[in-house]
Amino acid sequence: LTSWGRGDWVPVKSHSSKELTSSVYFYVDTKILANAAKMFNKTEDYKYYSALANKIKNAINDKFLNRETGIYGSGVQTEQSVPLQWGIVPEELKRKVARNLAKQVEAAGFHLDVGVLGAKAILNALSENGEAETAYKLAAQDTYPSWGCWIANGATTLLENWDLNATRDISDNHMMFGEIGGWFYKGLGGIFPDPENPGFKHILLRPNFPSGLNEFEARYQSPYGEICSKWERKKNRIVYHVTVPANSTATFYAPDNVKGERAVNLEAGKHILELPIKRAVY
């Protein structure tokens, strides 16, 4: 484990363990090295960095994860979301950890309580682990602290500080809170590359259809051409339009609130899927 780094820079109010967040990024960097070694057929390097990554992950979970409660560290938003985003959480505990994260967001009135590291992780951590409704409410929030609060107060760039009245850390053109832009493509449009088929040769489609949002469209220019993921709500169903570029294929994975098939393989071309929505239970 390591405590090197600046930690969750410019948080709203809650402070996260720097050892937890820095160690997660130590793991991420080690995984990158392992994957690169595999690509370049550096077998010994691949074995070394894979073993090191596994050792780091186990050390993080041994020290910070309460397996009974599904809480990392003190359970604040960043400490729950960063391990989810970067693949630290054991598979069988992902939904429990995500539910705890959603509870934290709900308790904050669907407002952020994160700095730079949590802002990178929180929307993905929610929407990719069964909590897309909470992710959307968080992304659509327009009162302090939120991305929308900046817009409501006239900002046209990404700021360095959630607090518009801050007297330090006040850059008016700072990319560090910018993950929400990518999340629109991933969390709502569901457009992901397939790690086994780089460059969008094969496309993974994992859109979410949160209540309160009736239509959405994302277009992405891949090396093979434009990918389009567009959906609209029609009473008790979603009409989902997909464009798969030439020489590519795709697999659509249905979110939890859709009835029927969980995965559909799609060839190149334009497709329309009629997706019945499950009735919400409160």
What is each residue range found by the language model?
Residues 37, 51, 133-282:
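Non-catalytic C-terminal accessory modules of carbohydrate-active enzymes
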Residues 77, 116, 129, 174-178:
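Alpha-helix initiation and capping sites
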Residues 1-54, 58-112, 116-124:
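The feature captures the catalytic groove of carbohydrate-active enzymes
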Residues 107-146, 153:
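Repeat-solenoid scaffold signature
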Residues 10, 67, 106, 110, ...:
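Generic preference for well-ordered secondary structure
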